[in-house]
């Protein structure tokens, strides 16, 4: 039994020994607090979880707590994105450093004298011979030196810069420098260089490998938390390289987020507006997609969503309980089952892959009050019309596949002129391209009208599609039900949901419009709005699919004896008894034969 128990431990060794958690979320949501919890020497899980847990969920929480309490807690290594920016600032010469710090236009920029003083404070660390050209060939005797520089010295230098600049100015300065690093590989150069596209995640990758070397040298598991990932391509880079990488979004209500920014970070409303415009830009195009912060898309592609209610600044029971839940499942998949809410949102997440929209994919699920699924939907064109992803501007310009297009698209001269001006030369000069030239009707029509009109979209919204599926196929009661959406309802879908009488709307990413404040918060039958907490996508299966049936695992770890009821013996027991009797008969027969030989005077 000891051998099989050791074998089970070996099965889970990879999941326990190497974990990477990348945090994402808007400033003020709690990413830094989450990282601090994971990096602590202790991880104290509340016995009763947090408010709102169902009876089954409380049972699962207790199983999670028992598991984590029964193993030694290993603190996570923390990689701060701000540290990567500090490292790039250290690569600047003195003149470049002073020029860059004193040239910023926001707030009150540092004077050249102040910038020179700051440079002097960092000078001793700049002299350490830890440059990009030798960091990829770390010898075993150099591990501690490199580790101390990147995981101890750099964070301390970041704090020095933070104290000199102040909170608001530091945030703006580092966001801009971070964009520059993503664009050019240098903190003071904003010109886009495609060869430096993955400079940021490659540096993250180096630090991950460095932490792994350090952990192996110390003979301890390697667990890493990254605070925080702000561009989705950084997450994609790491997801492709590490099976045990999880992107975790930390979310809170906008009210709590704003309160945190005002009370704890002491930001003014003007500074908060600048921050929000930076993290949630209205539209990102061209090379900026690879450069600027895009928190909305980071949240969309997250593997795990954690709701930080911020009910108490002292206990943070809900945050700690959720972290415990998912860290445990990362180490031991399938220890508990998913919640009903996770099951429903996973269906919505799967449904969104059916969307033919070339701008954004959204999925929705409608259930009754017991989470019994009644309909699913995704944003796409009405049944019978071809989704935008499958249509081609080349076909429309050349007059092919006319049934794919509307009469307006085929005959309106202004629209055809606009389409041709955008795509004719593009198609002609890229004949060898292997891409389908799909186009967005709404975008072209809005360019013609010089407006931003959402009415021109060809697709039904995911929530709207789910509502219509029910009425289309016979109709069912929805009053008191629950709406799940991988985004959140717009103003139009919010009104429909309100009219249908949903008691709860569970969403992942807040819609930037006024649907919540203006529509869903009015009247006497207001639905409850709940930020989603749970796993989705590949993480759902990776966390909840056990490596082997739990019964088999228990039997291999523990020597569980069988119970034998003498009054109702099982077939296996009877077989054992028959075999024993048969063996006894053989022995007895041999003794009888031996006695016969003795009696007859012959020796046996």
Regions found by a protein language model. Give the residues of each.
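Walker A/P-loop
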Residues: 32
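P-loop NTPase motor core
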Residues: 59-122
């Amino acid at each position: 039994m000891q051998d099989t128990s050791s074998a089970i431990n070996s099965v889970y060794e990879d999941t326990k020994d190497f974990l990477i958690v990348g945090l994402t979320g808007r400033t003020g949501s709690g990413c830094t607090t989450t990282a601090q919890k994971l990096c602590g020497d202790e991880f104290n899980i509340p016995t009763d979880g947090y408010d709102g847990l169902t009876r089954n969920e409380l049972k699962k929480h207790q199983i999670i707590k028992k598991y984590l309490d029964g193993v030694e807690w290993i603190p996570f290594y923390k990689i701060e994105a701000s540290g990567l920016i500090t490292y790039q600032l250290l690569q600047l010469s003195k003149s470049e450093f002073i020029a860059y710090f004193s040239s910023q236009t926001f707030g009150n920029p540092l004077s050249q004298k102040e910038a020179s003083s700051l440079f002097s404070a960092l000078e001793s660390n700049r002299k350490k011979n830890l440059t990009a050209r030798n960091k990829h060939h770390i010898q075993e005797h150099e591990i501690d030196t490199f580790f101390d520089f990147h995981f101890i010295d750099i964070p301390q230098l970041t704090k020095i810069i933070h104290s000199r600049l102040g909170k608001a100015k530091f945030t703006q300065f580092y966001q801009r420098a971070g964009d520059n690093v993503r664009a050019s590989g240098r903190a003071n150069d904003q010109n886009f260089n495609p060869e430096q596209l993955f400079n940021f995640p490659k540096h993250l990758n180096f630090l991950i490998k460095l932490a792994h070397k350090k952990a192996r040298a110390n003979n301890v598991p390697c667990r890493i938390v990254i605070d925080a990932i702000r561009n989705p391509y950084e997450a994609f880079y790491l997801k492709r390289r590490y099976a045990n990488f999880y992107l975790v979004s930390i979310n809170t209500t906008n009210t709590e987020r704003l309160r945190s920014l005002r009370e704890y970070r002491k930001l003014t409303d003007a500074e908060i507006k600048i921050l929000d415009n930076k993290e949630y830009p209205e539209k990102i195009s061209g090379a900026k997609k690879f450069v600027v912060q895009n928190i909305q898309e980071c949240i969309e592609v997250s593997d795990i969503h954690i709701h930080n209610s911020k009910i108490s600044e002292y206990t943070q029971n809900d945050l700690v309980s959720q972290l415990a839940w998912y860290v445990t499942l990362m180490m031991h998949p399938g220890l508990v089952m998913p919640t009903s809410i996770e099951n429903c949102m996973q269906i919505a997440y799967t449904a969104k892959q059916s969307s033919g929209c070339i701008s954004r994919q959204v999925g929705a699920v409608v259930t009754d009050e017991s989470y019994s699924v009644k309909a699913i939907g995704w944003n796409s064109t009405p049944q019978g019309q071809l989704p935008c992803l499958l249509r081609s501007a080349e076909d429309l310009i050349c007059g092919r596949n006319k049934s794919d297009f509307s009469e307006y698209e085929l005959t309106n001269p202004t629209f055809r002129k606009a389409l041709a001006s955008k795509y004719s030369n593009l198609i002609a000069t890229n004949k060898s391209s292997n891409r389908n030239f799909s186009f967005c009707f709404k975008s072209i029509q809005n360019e013609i009208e010089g407006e931003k009109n959402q009415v021109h979209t060809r697709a039904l919204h995911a929530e709207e599609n789910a509502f219509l599926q029910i009425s289309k196929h016979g109709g069912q009661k929805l009053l008191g039900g629950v709406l799940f959406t991988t985004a959140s309802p717009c103003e139009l879908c919010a009104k429909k949901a309100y009219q249908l009488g949903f008691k709860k709307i569970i969403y992942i990413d807040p819609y930037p419009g006024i649907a919540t404040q203006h529509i869903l918060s009015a009247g006497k039958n207001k639905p409850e709005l709940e930020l989603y907490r749970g796993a989705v996508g590949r993480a759902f299966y990776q966390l909840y699919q056990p490596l082997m049936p739990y019964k088999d695992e228990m039997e291999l770890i523990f020597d569980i004896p069988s119970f034998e009821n003498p009054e109702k013996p099982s077939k296996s027991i009877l077989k054992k008894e028959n075999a024993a009797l048969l063996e006894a008969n053989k022995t007895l027969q041999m003794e009888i034969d031996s006695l016969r030989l003795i009696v007859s005077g012959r020796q046996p």
